[in-house]
Curated annotation (Swiss-Prot):
It holds the Pfam family WD40. This is Nuclear distribution protein PAC1. PROSITE patterns: WD_REPEATS_1 (PS00678), WD_REPEATS_2 (PS50082), WD_REPEATS_REGION (PS50294). Residues 66-99 form a coiled coil. One of its GO terms (molecular function) is microtubule plus-end binding. Keywords: Cell cycle, Cell division, Coiled coil, Cytoplasm, Cytoskeleton, Microtubule, Mitosis, Repeat, Transport, WD repeat. Belongs to the WD repeat LIS1/nudF family. WD repeats lie at residues 119-158, 164-205, 206-246, 249-291, 294-328, 329-368, 389-428, 437-483. It is found in: Cytoplasm, Cytoskeleton; Cytoplasm, Cytoskeleton, Spindle pole. GO terms for cellular component: cytoplasmic microtubule; kinetochore; microtubule associated complex; nuclear envelope; spindle pole. Self-associates. Interacts with NDL1 and dynein. SUPFAM superfamilies: Lissencephaly-1 protein (Lis-1, PAF-AH alpha) N-terminal domain, WD40 repeat-like.
Length: 486
C-alpha cells in the first residue's frame, strides 16, 4: 500500500534541506561520512545546497519548530475562548430582536480572585484601562508610565515603560472619542499629552503646584480639564497647547474632578477639595452653580451618577421617604431641566471614611446667559444617603456601567461594591461584594469604559450598555502592584 504523502514535493525538499542545514554544525569532522550518507538518502547535494528552487533561511528548522509551538499554544487559547463563549451563549436569553445577551453581564462584578497581577518598582498611584485595546496603564510615584498587555502570557515585562515625568504621576485619562489621546498629570507641575502609540506630543505648563487630576471633555477631544494644589481649575486646548480658562473653585488644594456634558449648556465640572467641600461649576463661564458640604475631612474624589437606573432608584427612594427630606420639593424630582443638564445625582468620597450620595439642585437658567447658582436650598446639595463600611480613607470611586453599582477603594486595603437598589429594600446602600488582595493602600481603581457607539434611544440604553460592556476591572496600590480581577 502506497504511503500517504502529507507534504508536497517542494515542502519535502525544503524539509530535507533544513535537516541537513541543522545537522551540519553538529557533525564534526569525524561524522562527515554520516552526513554524506544522510544527504544521499534525502537526495541532497551538499555542494549545491543553495539551489534555485529552495531559498536558504538561517536556523530554518529551529524557527519552524518554535512557530509550531506558538501555534499550538494559540490553538489551545482559542479553544478555551470558544469554550467560554459557548458557556455564555448557553446561559443567555434572546431579546425580541434576536440579540443574545448574557443574563448576568449587565450586573457583572469580579468574583474576588485575581486574574492577573503586574508588579512595578514603585508605588502605583493611578491606573487606567485602554478604552479599546487590551491594555492596562499605570503611573507610579517615580514618574514612570507602564503599559501592560492583558493578552501577553508574561506578566513580568510591560509592553512599554516610559519615563513620563520627573515626579509622581497622579492621574491618567483618555479622550472619549477616537483617536484616543492620552494625558498624564504629575507632581512636577506639568500635564503631558501622548498620541495613540504613546509618543509624547505636547507638555502643558501653567499650574503653580501639583497637578492632582485631569479629564477630557466627553464631547471634544481637544478640551482637557485639570485641578491642582494651586486651587485652580484650568481648561486646556491640547492641540494648541494653551490654557483657555482658569478659575478658582476652592479655598484649599483641589483634589479631583469629574466632567459631564450638556447639549444645551456645554460642560459642567464637579470638583472636590481639602476644604471638605465639592463644587459644581459651569465650565464655559467658570461660575459656581452648586455646593456640596457635609464631610468632616478632605474630600478625595467625586463622580456624577449616570441617569441609567440611578435616577429612577433615587427618585423613588426620596418619594417614598419624604419625611426624611422635608426640604426637597417633590416637583423638583420631575424637573425637565435635569434632562437638559445630563446630571442629577453625584457621589463624594472622603478621608472621614465615608461615601456620600447627593441630589444636586439644578442651576438657574436665564435666556442668553450662562447657568447661574441654583435658587433651591441656597445652592446647597441635599444629602440622600451615607455609605459606611470602610475603616480608613476612601480615595477612589468609579461607577459600574449599569449605573446602580458604586465601587470604592480605600486605605483599609479593600475594594467594595455597593448596590443603590438596597435603598428601596432596606433604606441603605448595601455592600454586595468586598474584595481583598492588596497589601497596601488602594490608590486607584478603574472599570473598563463602554465601547464607543452611536446615540441610542432611552428605552434601548440598557440593552446597548449590556452589549457594549467590557467585563474588566483593575486596581492599583501602594504595594507596587496592579491587579486585574477575575
Amino acid at each position: 500500500m502506497e504511503k500517504l504523502q502529507i507534504l508536497t514535493e517542494r515542502q519535502q525538499t525544503e524539509l530535507n534541506h533544513a535537516i541537513i542545514q541543522y545537522l551540519q554544525p553538529l557533525c564534526q569532522q569525524d561524522n562527515h561520512v554520516l552526513l554524506d550518507q544522510l544527504s544521499k538518502l534525502l537526495n541532497i547535494d551538499q555542494s549545491t545546497q543553495e539551489s534555485n528552487n529552495v531559498e536558504k533561511v538561517d536556523n530554518y528548522l529551529e524557527k519552524r519548530w518554535s512557530t509550531v509551538l506558538r501555534l499550538q499554544k494559540k490553538i489551545i487559547d482559542l479553544e478555551n475562548e470558544i469554550s467560554n463563549l459557548n458557556n455564555i451563549i448557553n446561559s443567555t436569553n434572546s431579546d425580541n430582536n434576536g440579540i443574545i445577551l448574557s443574563k448576568d453581564k449587565i450586573n457583572w462584578i469580579p468574583k474576588g480572585a485575581v486574574k492577573q497581577s503586574y508588579q512595578c518598582e514603585n508605588i502605583v498611584t493611578t491606573v487606567k484601562l485602554h478604552p479599546n485595546l487590551p491594555l492596562v496603564l499605570n503611573g507610579c510615584n517615580d514618574g514612570n508610565l507602564y503599559i501592560w498587555n492583558i493578552s501577553n502570557d508574561d506578566n513580568t515585562i510591560p509592553e512599554k515603560m516610559i519615563k513620563a515625568h520627573t515626579r509622581a504621576i497622579n492621574k491618567i485619562c483618555f479622550t472619549y472619542k477616537k483617536p484616543y489621546y492620552l494625558a498624564t498629570c504629575s507632581s512636577d507641575l506639568t500635564i503631558k499629552i501622548w498620541d495613540e502609540k504613546f509618543n509624547h506630543i505636547r507638555t502643558l505648563n501653567g499650574h503653580e503646584h501639583t497637578v492632582s487630576s485631569i479629564q477630557f471633555s466627553p464631547v471634544d477631544n481637544s478640551i482637557l480639564y485639570s485641578v491642582s494644589r494651586d486651587k485652580n481649575i484650568r481648561v486646556w486646548d491640547i492641540f494648541q497647547g494653551i490654557s483657555l480658562k482658569s478659575f478658582v473653585g476652592h479655598s484649599e488644594w483641589c483634589r479631583d474632578l469629574d466632567i459631564i456634558s450638556s447639549d444645551t449648556y456645554g460642560d459642567f465640572v464637579l470638583t472636590c477639595s481639602n476644604d471638605q467641600s465639592a463644587r459644581l461649576s459651569h465650565a464655559n463661564s467658570g461660575a459656581g452653580v452648586a455646593m456640596i458640604v457635609g464631610h468632616s475631612h478632605v474630600v478625595e474624589t467625586v463622580k456624577f451618577l449616570p441617569s441609567l437606573q440611578a435616577n429612577k432608584i433615587l427618585d423613588e427612594y426620596i418619594t417614598k421617604n419624604t419625611e426624611q427630606f422635608p426640604t426637597i420639593p417633590l416637583e423638583l424630582l420631575k424637573d425637565k431641566t435635569y434632562n437638559q443638564l445630563g446630571f442629577k445625582y453625584c457621589i463624594t468620597a472622603s478621608r472621614d471614611n465615608t461615601i456620600k450620595l447627593w441630589l444636586i439642585p439644578p442651576p438657574t437658567i436665564a435666556p442668553h446667559r450662562p447657568p447661574l447658582p441654583s435658587k433651591y436650598n441656597n445652592s446647597q446639595s441635599w444629602l440622600i444617603a451615607e455609605l459606611k463600611g470602610h475603616s480608613s480613607w476612601v480615595k477612589s470611586l468609579c461607577v459600574h456601567p449599569n449605573g446602580k453599582f458604586i465601587i470604592s477603594g480605600s486605605d483599609d486595603k479593600t475594594i467594595k461594591f455597593w448596590d443603590l437598589s438596597g435603598l428601596l429594600e432596606t433604606g441603605y446602600v448595601n455592600v454586595v461584594k468586598t474584595i481583598i488582595g492588596h497589601d497596601g493602600f488602594i490608590n486607584d481603581i478603574d472599570f473598563a469604559r463602554l465601547k464607543e457607539a452611536s446615540d441610542v434611544s432611552e428605552e434601548d440604553l440598557l440593552k446597548q450598555v449590556e452589549k457594549r460592556m467590557r467585563c474588566l476591572f483593575i486596581s492599583g496600590s501602594a504595594d507596587n502592584s496592579i491587579k486585574l480581577w477575575n
